[in-house]
A protein has these predicted regions:
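C-terminal alpha-helical "lid/dimerization" subdomain adjacent to the S-adenosyl-L-methionine
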Residues: 1, 10-16, 50, 131-193
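Conserved class I S-adenosyl-L-methionine
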Residues: 1-32, 47-48, 71
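A structural alpha-helix within SAM-dependent methyltransferase catalytic domains
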Residues: 27, 50-53, 117, 121
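Phosphate-coordination loops involved in phosphoryl transfer and adenosine-cofactor binding
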Residues: 35
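Class I SAM-dependent methyltransferase SAM/SAH-binding core
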Residues: 39-91
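A conserved beta-strand element that flanks and buttresses the S-adenosyl-L-methionine
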Residues: 102
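Short catalytic micro-motifs in class I SAM-dependent methyltransferases
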Residues: 105-106
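A short glycine-rich, Lys/Arg-flanked "PGG" loop and its adjoining helix->strand segment in the class I
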Residues: 114-129
């Protein structure tokens, strides 16, 4: 799905809007520090990483799309700040512990949300945070019909909160990052920050 889109991904107007809003939410709602080691899960071409990188020490960009990550490593501003991992962390953990795991619009591509959140907890230091953004529950019209790799039509916030709590997260705070207009419909995107207990 993402191989043919990788080259032009950064030019997509909706992607630009999402990047600006979600990175703004991360910067405004997470106390980013120069010593932080951050995982960008579902990093894609590194748009969110590019915005967060100046505020932290190092970013590990994780994605299963090699073509997306190739676009990421070509970015000059990320050259000395980012390492890339093309792997599925549910079956192949990174072996590191992070101060923050951030993820933008990747969770609806993950079949087992509960297990993914469990893996996030396992990869975080105690007291570290997750900062996640994805679609609020929608009617399935956001993505084209029959598209591969889309397992959820967004999420109910209370159900997502329950998954976070079940996997040891506290201080859970949701905001609306932005509302995406698409083909005469509006799709709210939530942003949630939570702390590993």
């Amino acid at each position: 799905m993402f191989k043919e889109k990788a080259k032009d991904w950064d030019m997509n107007e909706m992607v630009k809007q999402l990047t600006s809003a979600i990175s703004g939410c991360i910067i405004d709602n997470v106390d980013l520090k120069e010593k932080m080691h951050v995982m960008d899960f579902g990093a894609g071409t590194g748009l969110i990483s590019s915005k967060v990188a100046p505020h932290v020490n190092k970013i590990t960009a994780v994605d299963i799309s090699q073509s997306m990550l190739e676009q990421l490593i070509s970015k000059q501003e990320l050259k000395d700040k980012v390492e890339i991992l093309c792997q599925d962390i549910t079956t192949q953990p990174t072996g590191d512990s992070y101060d923050l795991i951030m993820s933008a619009m990747a969770m609806h591509h993950i079949k087992d949300t509960d297990n993914m959140v469990k893996q996030f907890a396992a990869h975080l230091k105690p007291g570290a945070k997750v900062a996640l953004a994805d679609l609020d529950k929608e009617d399935g019209s956001f993505h084209p019909e029959g598209i591969e790799g889309v397992y959820h039509d967004g999420f109910e916030r209370n159900e997502f909160q329950t998954i976070l709590e079940k996997n040891g997260f506290k201080d859970i705070n949701f905001v609306t990052a932005l509302t995406v207009p698409k083909e005469e419909k509006l799709y709210p995107v939530f942003f949630v920050v939570a702390t590993k207990a």
